[in-house]
A protein has these predicted regions:
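A short Gly-Trp-Pro
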Residues: 2-38, 46-96
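Polyanion-binding surface elements
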Residues: 42
Length: 96
């Protein structure tokens, strides 16, 4: 298990590179946002997910976010193909 630490400051987020940490962009026209995170395994890799606050965007791979930064949750699970697969629930990354 890895705690999902939210960063408001994008530059600090990119500099610190804390495993499992995340930064969320402001909403676009359709309400979609970018959820950028460092891999919970600690490898230092970074990825971007398309999310919606309370909804799953319709086009392309996307996730429904619960709107919380303190106890963030994403659905469905996050599958970083060939690398890491798990859930973000109650602010904690849990590997499958």
């Amino acid at each position: 298990m890895t705690r999902a630490v939210h960063y408001r400051d994008r530059n600090a987020f990119l500099q610190d590179q804390v495993p499992g940490s995340f930064w969320i962009s402001g909403p676009e026209e359709k309400g979609e946002q970018s959820f950028i995170f460092f891999c919970p395994c600690g490898c230092g890799d970074k990825s971007v997910l398309k999310i919606g606050n309370g909804f799953k965007p319709k086009h392309g791979p996307s996730w429904c976010w619960n709107g919380s930064t303190a106890a963030a949750e994403l659905a469905p699970s996050v599958n970083w193909q060939g690398h890491w697969h798990g859930w973000l629930q109650a602010g904690v990354w849990r590997s499958c």
